[in-house]
């Protein structure tokens, strides 16, 4: 999960009113360009590539019908709720498998920086960031649980594979720490971070680079 900058609302949302219109009436293809502009071709929650996708209501429309067409409540999530076979993570899992939760206890990536709450390990797992207590710790724990960010075996394996693929380069760069001036070494690190800007599981890769010394 990465921090997102929400842009202006798609105009089509202004044509629909909660209580008068149903979500399935809207042409969702007119909403997707703005979602893609905000989050790229990746899931807003797990950062996998959106090969299967749906528009997710952060606060579910069944419980919060007034938010059905509210732009700030919409994200692009992996999984296609129209296809059989279920989906064991992110938006579909949140509202069909996670059990009871309070949306206020979840990280909302367009309002908060997930880096303040979550740390991805080189094993592919994600854990609460070091030093969290109280409400911040609960948010991290509930976000991991409700979106099932560690419990989906396919997701965990894909994330681990992506991280392990860069670890030789990570380890090599860190082996050069004593050979370069700090500014020069940091510039090399920035170059590596730029290379992953458009990669799947970008945050996990970024944490492998930036937190390597503690969690390799």
Curated annotation (Swiss-Prot):
<keyword id="KW-0255">Endonuclease</keyword>
<keyword id="KW-0051">Antiviral defense</keyword>
<keyword id="KW-0378">Hydrolase</keyword>
<protein>
    <recommendedName>
        <fullName>Retron Ec78 putative HNH endonuclease</fullName>
    </recommendedName>
</protein>
<dbReference type="InterPro" id="IPR013467">
    <property type="entry name" value="HNH78-like"/>
</dbReference>
<keyword id="KW-0540">Nuclease</keyword>
<dbReference type="GO" id="GO:0004519">
    <property type="term" value="F:endonuclease activity"/>
</dbReference>
<comment type="function">
    <text>Putative HNH endonuclease component of antiviral defense system retron Ec78, composed of a non-coding RNA (ncRNA), a reverse transcriptase (RT), a probable ATPase and this protein. Expression of retron Ec78 confers protection against bacteriophage T5. At multiplicity of infection (MOI) of 0.02 cultures slow growth when infected with T5 but do not collapse, at MOI 2 cultures enter growth stasis.</text>
</comment>
<dbReference type="InterPro" id="IPR053575">
    <property type="entry name" value="Retron_Ec78_HNH_endo"/>
</dbReference>
<dbReference type="GO" id="GO:0051607">
    <property type="term" value="P:defense response to virus"/>
</dbReference>
């Amino acid at each position: 999960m990465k921090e997102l900058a929400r842009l202006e609302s798609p105009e089509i949302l202004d044509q629909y009113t909660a209580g008068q219109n149903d979500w399935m009436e809207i042409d969702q293809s007119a909403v997707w360009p703005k979602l893609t502009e905000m989050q790229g071709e990746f899931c807003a929650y797990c950062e996998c590539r959106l090969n299967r996708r749906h528009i997710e209501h952060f606060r579910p429309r069944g419980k919060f019908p007034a938010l059905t067409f509210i732009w700030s409540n919409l994200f692009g999530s992996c999984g296609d709720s129209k296809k059989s076979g279920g989906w064991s993570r992110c938006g579909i899992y949140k509202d069909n498998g996670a059990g009871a939760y309070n949306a206020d206890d979840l990280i909302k990536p367009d309002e908060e920086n997930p880096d303040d709450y979550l740390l991805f390990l080189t094993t592919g797992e994600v854990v609460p960031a070091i030093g969290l207590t109280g409400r911040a710790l609960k948010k991290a724990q509930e976000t991991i649980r409700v979106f099932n960010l560690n419990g989906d075996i396919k997701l965990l394996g894909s994330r681990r594979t992506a991280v392990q693929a860069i670890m030789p380069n990570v380890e090599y760069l860190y082996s050069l720490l004593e050979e370069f001036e700090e500014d020069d070494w940091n510039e090399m690190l920035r170059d590596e971070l730029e290379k992953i800007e458009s990669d799947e599981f970008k945050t996990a890769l970024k944490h492998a680079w930036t937190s390597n010394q503690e969690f390799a």
